[in-house]
Structures are given as C-alpha cells and as structure tokens.
C-alpha cells in the first residue's frame, strides 16, 4: 500500500476503536492528522477561554516543521499502537 493509502486506512480504523483513547492520545493523533493533511499550523491561537480549541491548536503546533510524509508515518504508527491497545 502507498503511504497515503496506509494513512487513510489508519484514519478510518481509529474511528472504530472499541474504547475511546485518552485525551492525550487523541491530541497526539489530532496533531499528526492536521500536520499530515494541512502541514504547518496556519491559524491563530484560540483565546484562553476556548480550552478545547487551545488544546487542539497546541497539539498541532507541536508538530510544526514535521514533513507531511513523516507526520503520516507517525500517525499510522500511533494508530496501530492504539488499535493494539484498544481493539477494533
């Protein structure tokens, strides 16, 4: 499979996990997903009262500078780790 196909499959599989991952695991996946699909963060940091938006922004911002290909590979690895941990 191509890296893009692996990524697309992993993104679909993560939605089917039997148990919801922890918030930290979800933030890690979110940051890698956005870096894979959009690239470096391109939006303003949300206000401090938007806790969920700020957490997502921080997760994505931590991946800044990572190439889309490396982010895809890291996302697939993390997804496989979560599938092993939580099952489909």
Curated annotation (Swiss-Prot):
Brain. Is selectively expressed in glial cells. Residues 3-88 form the ACB domain. The keyword Endoplasmic reticulum applies. One of its GO terms (molecular function) is fatty-acyl-CoA binding. It comes from the Eukaryota. GO terms for cellular component: endoplasmic reticulum; Golgi apparatus. This is Acyl-CoA-binding protein homolog.
